[in-house]
């Protein structure tokens, strides 16, 4: 009997998060749904959200047809980097939440790097 796709993704995410917690740096966590993208930066111990951005916010939503394409990923990546730098965070660990580093996840990460985050 095989495990489900989402269960396998969550298992990969758990392993990654344990490794990142040992590093002791803030983590950029990404959630991808069929319609939207969400990005949050957590403290090193994972207890508090420092900055957040998603495709439901008006700064990102303006000018987009929908929140599930690569243009939306670029806007979310730039916005999360801008908000992180505003609170003094420039070095993070990227938590892709078990998703493949491909498509919207990769585009969001590249946009955040271009906007000044280091990971």
Swiss-Prot record:
GO terms (BP aspect): translation
Keyword annotations from UniProtKB, A to Z: Ribonucleoprotein, Ribosomal protein, RNA-binding, rRNA-binding
InterPro entries: Ribosomal_uL18_bac-type, Ribosomal_uL18_bac/euk
UniProt keyword Ribosomal protein, yes or no: yes
Pfam families assigned: Ribosomal_L18p
Entry keyword RNA-binding: yes
Entries under Gene3D superfamilies matching the protein: 3.30.420.100
GO MF, one example: structural constituent of ribosome
GO cellular component, one term: cytosolic large ribosomal subunit
Subunit structure of this chain's protein: Part of the 50S ribosomal subunit; part of the 5S rRNA/L5/L18/L25 subcomplex. Contacts the 5S and 23S rRNAs.
Protein task: This is one of the proteins that bind and probably mediate the attachment of the 5S RNA into the large ribosomal subunit, where it forms part of the central protuberance.
UniProt record similarity statement: Belongs to the universal ribosomal protein uL18 family.
Name this protein carries in UniProt: Large ribosomal subunit protein uL18
Originating organism: Xylella fastidiosa (strain Temecula1 / ATCC 700964)
Species classification: Bacteria, Pseudomonadati, Pseudomonadota, Gammaproteobacteria, Lysobacterales
